[in-house]
Amino acid sequence: MSINPIVLLFALLCTLLSPFSIGQSTIIHEQKSLYQDIVVFEHQDFRCLSFTAKKGERVQTCEYQDPQDKRIYFPYVRMTLAGLLFNPKPERILIIGLGGGSVPSALAELYPESHMDIVEIDPVVSQIAERYFYFQPSHNTRVHTGDARVYIKRAGLKGQKYDFILLDAFNGEYIPEHLMTREFLMETKQLLSSSGVLVANTFSTSKLYDHESATYRSVFGEFYNFKIPQESGNRVILSMLTSLPNQQALQQQAEALASALQPFAIEIENYPSLMTLEADWDEQARLLTDQFSPANLLK
């Protein structure tokens, strides 16, 4: 007896998303793109997006079905807005990786006059974000379909600068190796404005950790390492061109931002105490470069 691959996918998906169960969830859309299989499903008051690529592993983003509910569901997604502690009034924003559009939507509401560029390699993801996750680009937002490395190189040649850069193109299934190298980070660094902040959503539990950390340190010098205990294994790297603010300054800024971020379920006043400048990696680890970047073997 043959097994319907969609049924099998759904069963595996629900197992990975415990406590969501197959009896309580409903697939509302599934589509194969050039890069991955994409599933949208609903569970109670959530709607979730799942990507499936080479090895059957998945990364999910979930949002509340009520379009008036602004809360960001996953803690690791909320963590990326810690970058606002370093630049609370970004006028130009660059986001690499769209997903369901939770972070761009939040930033667009917080800063309606700011210009935002979003780079997403998969056009199907952009379509699904708009159709199922209430992502509506404003007149100040442009979604660019293409490879982020190419976009950043071209932006650098044009002399473009950004106050807030978010690297969020990685997932548990596949890491774009060319977006982790020292050369790529140098190109990205050139796009930062004098007060700009780089935010990288990445992993804290992999063999890649030492190499990635050493590579970021080689390009940016000191950076804040932000982890939430007992969370998904994600971490957020935060750095700037200028000297980094101390813990006291971060806490003061968190208190100033707290009320604005409360509708998104971001308890930013708790974030500074979870950030550290201390190196907890092998500082002699080999740097990731365009010639050496075995990211998917090391994860």
From Swiss-Prot:
Signal peptide: none
Subcellular location as annotated: Cytoplasm
InterPro entries in the record: PABS (IPR030374), SAM-dependent_MTases_sf (IPR029063), Spermi_synthase (IPR001045)
Binding site residues for S-methyl-5'-thioadenosine: 36, 120, 147-148
The enzyme's E.C. designation: 2.5.1.16
Reaction(s) catalysed (UniProt annotation): S-adenosyl 3-(methylsulfanyl)propylamine + putrescine = S-methyl-5'-thioadenosine + spermidine + H(+)
Domain PABS, chain residue ranges per copy: 6-252
A single Gene Ontology CC term: cytoplasm
Pathway the protein contributes to: Amine and polyamine biosynthesis; spermidine biosynthesis; spermidine from putrescine: step 1/1
Active site residues per record: 168
SS bond list: none
Leading EC class: transferase
Keywords assigned: Cytoplasm, Polyamine biosynthesis, Spermidine biosynthesis, Transferase
Glycosyltransferase recorded as keyword: no
Predominant location: cytoplasm
Alphabetized PROSITE patterns for the sequence: PABS_2 (PS51006)
Example of a GO MF term: spermidine synthase activity
The protein's role, per its UniProt record: Catalyzes the irreversible transfer of a propylamine group from the amino donor S-adenosylmethioninamine (decarboxy-AdoMet) to putrescine (1,4-diaminobutane) to yield spermidine.
Subunit structure, as described in the record: Homodimer or homotetramer.
Protein name: Polyamine aminopropyltransferase
Organism: Vibrio vulnificus (strain CMCP6)
Taxonomic lineage from the root: Bacteria, Pseudomonadati, Pseudomonadota, Gammaproteobacteria, Vibrionales
Name of encoding gene: speE
